[in-house]
Structures are given as structure tokens and as C-alpha cells.
Amino acid sequence: MKSYGFDGNAPQGLGRKVTSVYVYEAPVRLWHWVTVLCIITLSVTGYLIGKPLPSVPGEATFNFVMGYIRFAHFTAGYILAIGLIGRLYWALVGNHHAREIILVPIWDKGWWKEFFFEVRWYMFIERYPKKYIGHNPVGQIAMATFLWAAVFMCFSGFALYGEGLGTKSWAYQAFGWVISAFGGNSLTVHNWHRLGMWSIILFVMIHVYAAIREDIMSKQSMVSTMISGFRMFKD
């Protein structure tokens, strides 16, 4: 089933106006909000790991703040990675909308037509919005890019984690090749990892803006949809 933009105010079904459609299943919504918490935790702790707090003299047992920060970062990284695996699994067994950000139909001319329409809409060139049950094409591209960025962050993060644990650790054995791919310089991996953090922070800012904007201007629910699972058409 294609869920490209609908003409008119809201989609029609069985001869009557549809005001709500169940879109996002519980696992997708859970993944979304768990990922939100992970990104917040990883961004704050990652920044502090890159720019540590001033050293405090005294017994390490009572001044273990950076240790707790690193532990929170590593824990959130594990959760993010497990969540990504679960999200990919649900793309295989979930409904059509669970696959939208995994398999983007860039081979479809109709999809590109909708994509450029949405670009014009976001640039305030188009006067009236279209309705989408799931993600619009711009949203699909954005979320697919985020997924690949998150995968890169997990790979590079576990590579750096493995270097700290030692060459015999599972993390280094599984992801040590990432450092080799960057010329064997872990500082280069660290710099790209940090750039990835700022890129994801920028993505989050745009994502939140776009969701609130669409909620108001396109007259279809966005934020509440990721809570209830239902897309509401308001006109």
C-alpha cells in the first residue's frame, strides 16, 4: 500500500471521511521515545567526556563523577544499539509504516514527485499541504539518514570503547576494524564520532521544528501520533 500525499482535506475510505488512522505500532513508538532518552543522555555525557569537568583532589571513591558520566554514556550506547537492532527487526515483521524509513522507494517516480512537493511546502512555496498517513517523503529521507548516522555512532562508539577495554575485549574484536578503516588513528574516529553527535543534535532540532510545524500547519497530528499511534486529520 502506498501512502503518498492525498488530494483534498483528508483521505477517504469506504465512502466516508476518515478522521484517524492507526499508523505506528507500540514497538515503533517505544523505540522512538527510548531513542529520544538515549540521544539526550549520550549527547550530554558525550560532551562532558570530550570536555571533562575539572579534576577534584581527594579519594577517587568519593570523586567518581566522570566515572558515572562514562557509565551513563556506555549504558545509553548499549540501549541505543539494542534498540536499532529491534527497530530493524520490527521493520520486517511490523506493518507497512514500520518499513517506511528503512526501505525508501527512491526508484518510484511518484515518490520523487511527492518529495519535491514537500520541499516546496517546507520552503513556503506551496500554499496548501498534502495529507500523509505515515512519513512524508522528506521525513522518510531524514529518518533514514538518522538511522544510518545512529549505526555509524554505534560502530565508532564501540570501536573507541573497545580500545579502552583492550585488544582482547569483545568490543575491540568486533569493532576494532573501524579504527583501522580510519588509518589506525583513534583520534580521527573520535573526531568523526563527535561530529556525528553534533549532526544528530542538529537533526533533532530540525525534526522537532518540522513535527510541530506540521502539527499546526498541515492540520494532521504529529506529536500525539507518536504517543497514541493514531494519525488524526483535523479538517
Per-region residue spans from a language model:
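Membrane-embedded alpha-helical bundles that constitute the cytochrome b-like, heme-associated redox core
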Residues: M1-D235
